[in-house]
Amino acid sequence: KLQYPNPLSGQNEFSALAQQLQVVARTIQAGQAGKLGVKRQVFFVSLGGFDTHNNQNPTHADLLARVAHAMRYFDTALGAIGARNNVTTFTASDFGRTFTSNGDGTDHGWGAHQFVMGGAVRGGDLYGAFPTLVAKSSNEFDSPDQVRNGAMLPTTSVDQLGATLGRWFGLSDGQATQVFPNLANFN
């Protein structure tokens, strides 16, 4: 089903992200049948709209509903073709938001959460450290972990996630640092 329930309107809406993942699942299925002649495949799909600023609360809820629906759809599709244990799906973005308001929403930040899904993934684990939050009011937070203006430095970078998956594909440590030059900034 390529429709998801929009948490704001309560209406079912078309999911372009789920449609992209439908194409990926079909391509994986063709690869399993030996029609493509490749051993490992990499696919990229995208969902924009995360530059929310002052519309963050309602817009972010809808965006996360789209991601949740599309990942569930893809997991179901992979299960139907017997590929769930052979596919790792992950989100990757260096785009985050600040924790503090700029008076009209939040600004661009460095820290963000990523999801990893697949039959070979040890689920339920969180990597990195969640920042300490101190409530200033019902909708305002502060943190001693801020660098400045509400920006947080991530403890686990998207580069580390990408390098881990790259090593699975056969990258050496030296190649990983060439592909992900910020690796040296994280331990």
Regions found by a protein language model. Name each.
Residues 2-36, 41-74:
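Membrane-embedded translocation segments of transport machinery
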Residues 36-39, 49-187:
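Feature marks hydrolase-like catalytic cores characterized by long aromatic- and Gly/Pro-rich stretches
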